[in-house]
UniProtKB/Swiss-Prot annotation:
This is Threonine--tRNA ligase. Zn(2+) binds at C367, H418, H545. Belongs to the class-II aminoacyl-tRNA synthetase family. Its main location: cytoplasm. The gene is thrS. Homodimer. It comes from Rhodococcus erythropolis (strain PR4 / NBRC 100887).
Length: 685
């Protein structure tokens, strides 16, 4: 979640040889305080430099303000150093891990004797404020040799590892090493110049700690050194830092709203789903109300796929391991698969093998099985494009540390399609598939998109460079033709082909990766897929992988947070609830709900002993879109009164009109929450 930062490019600034960048910035009249203060500069090669940097020749640089994303990132990295200094002041035996800036904040990992408590975080915040108030200067120092660095950092084992292992220099979370020099940043007393604290770091940093006007520590958690569960256990402290108190307050309010919308919290409050310990991590179960929402999501998707010419298939959950040897998954995706199940082995009495067993795997992806369906009989060019679709359950061994509610699970159902077409059909099929995906997402109320093009990872791919280049170029053409912003994702593709992913912004402006469209020339080769062309020649089809929701579970979680649990009426598990003013009027509402049920509406009457106002509060909390009230006048007039989630109301609507209004609203699949203002025009019809 990010509050948008102004990304205006400052005019180039000339820094004379022998002059610090900071001096040139001040003499040019740039702001010296406030959210637009310049914190670093960008040189001609795009590298961010400290304001203390002194070029040897005249250079043009771009001043970078605190209120830009790059400026914020530098502030957050410096705040991570302040945090680390505070931790070592409060916990002198703490050893330093890594402390990078991340989206909207920063973290630092520490080896300490026990987990941090909320009270610890409060103490650390107090200590950080003292450090910031002291205006310590960040001073870059080049270490003469690796040996000198080892001596200076002898008490920091994790830093020593980073010095010796340069494999992390391209990792954005490894800020300690990189480039041609080994550098340490000292925090200096502004009056005496004495070193107060230091850390191995490649920088850059803000000039002084006073350039951190707003920060907050948000939480702590367990972590592993370098993210590897086989490494040392560490404690991670997260925080956020901003260019102004106003910007931070805006972010914290956004964070609070995100917590209110957290699908895990709402899943419990609305009785939608749960994660029983007995099943294991990342394996959700959907309760009846959640099951209704999921069924409605799937049913609408099915109807749209039928209209678009998809054919439905079904495949098993497990398969022999040989299938994934053919597909390449065991070579390239084994770490993401559950371990093999060795079955069907028979032993003699002496323990020797009479009949060898076989390895079976839970399927991590549906594509190999869909290829077997394509290959089950001869195919003609007349059948292409062939669009095979399945709500297919797959299982992936996600590390426990990354599992998160419904948005990152181990068992999931993908709305998975594989399209087989000729090369001549490829571009048109990609174009129509992308448009189909975007239109269907809009039908669920998501309509703010951009595209991301993931290209080849040079260390992890199969197939020829020529084929990859053709596939990538075609996807790029289709993405650009859509009119949406196309953002590059270098090296982000799966091993078998480049992809376009649809990135969706929700009601809070957060970005979620949703649909993927992946071009694959590789698997048809590995599975020897063929069709007979119009010239009678056997030809390889082009294969397109396509998942619209990503997974049903993930999409469910995203929609829950997008709507804050107040699902559109067509998806709501309970669409209408009748609330009598007194028990005597309950039968009237029961008759109304019978009519609604006959029209396919999910309706019920609250017969509880609670007072009417409490019933209204309860069903408002449960996000019921339509509440129908009935008192003496309503019964006498054969009418009901509408009450909506926002507290608005329309009184005295004839029952038949009320049924019509509700069924039409649901039938149109309106994604807005019904209110008196929105429903009133239908009353007048």
């Amino acid at each position: 979640m990010t509050s948008p930062a102004p990304e205006h490019s400052a005019a180039p600034l000339r820094v004379p040889a022998g002059t610090t960048a900071g001096t040139a910035v001040r003499e040019a009249g740039y702001p010296t305080k406030g959210p637009d203060v310049i914190v670093v500069v960008r040189d001609g090669e795009g590298t961010l430099k400290d304001l203390s940097w002194t070029p040897e020749v005249d250079v043009d640089v771009e001043p970078v303000a605190a209120s830009t994303e790059d400026g914020r990132s530098v502030i957050r990295h410096s705040a991570a150093h302040v945090l680390a200094q505070a931790v070592q002041k409060e916990f002198p035996d703490a050893k330093l891990g890594i402390g990078p800036p991340i989206k909207d904040g920063f973290y630092y990992d520490f080896a300490v004797d026990r987990p941090f408590t909320p009270e610890d975080l409060a103490k650390l915040e107090k200590r950080m404020k003292q450090i910031i108030k002291g205006s310590q200067r960040f001073s870059r120092r080049v270490v003469d040799s690796i040996e000198d660095a080892r001596v200076e950092l002898a008490d920091e084992p994790f830093k020593l590892e980073l010095i010796d292992d340069k494999s992390g220099i391209d990792d954005p979370e490894i800020m300690e090493v990189g480039g041609n020099e080994l550098t340490i940043y000292d925090n200096l007393d502004p009056r005496t110049g004495d070193k107060i604290w230091s850390d191995l770091c490649r920088g850059p940093h803000i000039p002084t700690t006073k350039h951190i006007p707003a920060f907050k520590l948000t939480r702590s958690s367990a972590a592993y050194w370098r993210g590897n569960q086989d490494n040392a256990d560490l404690q991670r402290v997260y925080g956020t830092a901003w260019e102004s108190t106003e910007a931070q307050d805006e972010y914290l309010e956004l964070l609070a709203e995100a917590e209110r919308r957290d699908h895990r919290k709402l899943g419990t409050e609305l009785d939608l789903f749960s994660f029983p310990d007995e099943l294991g991590s990342g394996l959700p179960v959907f309760h009846p109300k959640g099951g209704i929402i999921r069924t409605e999501m799937e049913n609408y998707s099915r109807s749209r796929h039928i209209e678009a010419g998809y054919e439905f298939v079904n495949t098993p959950h497990i398969t022999k391991g040989h299938l994934y040897e053919v597909s390449g998954h065991l070579d390239w995706y084994r770490d993401g698969m559950f371990p093999a199940m060795h079955v069907d082995e028979e032993l003699n009495e002496d323990g020797t093998v009479r009949k060898p067993g076989q390895d079976y795997y839970l399927k991590p992806m549906n594509c190999p099985m869909h290829n077997l369906i394509f290959r089950a009989r001869g195919r003609s060019y007349r059948e292409l494009p062939l669009r095979l679709f399945e709500f297919g359950s797959v299982y992936r061994y996600e590390k426990s540390g990354v599992i998160h509610g419904l948005t990152r699970v181990r068992g999931m159902t993908q709305d998975d399609a594989h399209i087989y077409c000729t090369r001549e059909q490829m571009r048109d099929e990609l174009t129509t598939t992308l448009q189909f995906v975007l239109n269907l997402l809009k039908d669920y109320g998501l309509d703010d998109f951009y595209l991301e093009l993931s290209t080849k990872n040079p260390d992890k791919f199969v197939g020829s460079d020529d084929v990859w280049e053709e596939a990538t170029a075609t996807l790029a053409e289709v993405g650009e033709a859509s009119g949406l912003t196309l953002v590059p994702d270098p090296g982000g593709a799966a091993f078998y082909g480049p992809k376009i992913s649809v990135q969706v912004k929700d009601a809070l402006g957060r970005t979620w990766q949703m649909s993927t469209i992946q071009l694959d020339f590789n698997l048809p080769e590995r599975f020897e897929l063929e069709y007979t062309g119009n010239d009678g020649v056997k030809t390889r089809p082009v294969m397109i992988h396509r998942a619209l929701f990503g997974s049903i579970e993930r999409f469910f979680g995203v929609l829950t947070e997008h709507y804050a649990g107040a699902f559109p009426a067509w998806l709501a598990p309970v669409q209408v609830v009748g609330i009598p003013v007194a028990e005597a009027f309950a039968d009237h509402l029961f008759d109304v709900t019978k009519k609604l049920k006959a029209a396919g509406v999910r309706a019920e009457v609250d017969f509880s002993d609670d007072r009417m106002q409490k019933k209204i509060r309860n069903h408002t909390t449960q996000k019921v879109p339509f509440m129908l009230l009935a008192g003496e006048r309503d019964v006498e007039a054969g009418a009901v009164s509408f009450r909506f989630r926002d507290g608005t109301q329309i009184n005295g609507i004839p029952v038949d009109d009320a049924v019509r209004i509700i069924t039409e609203w649901i039938g149109r699949r309106e994604n807005a929450s019904p209110t008196a203002e929105l429903v009133q025009p239908s009353v007048a019809q």
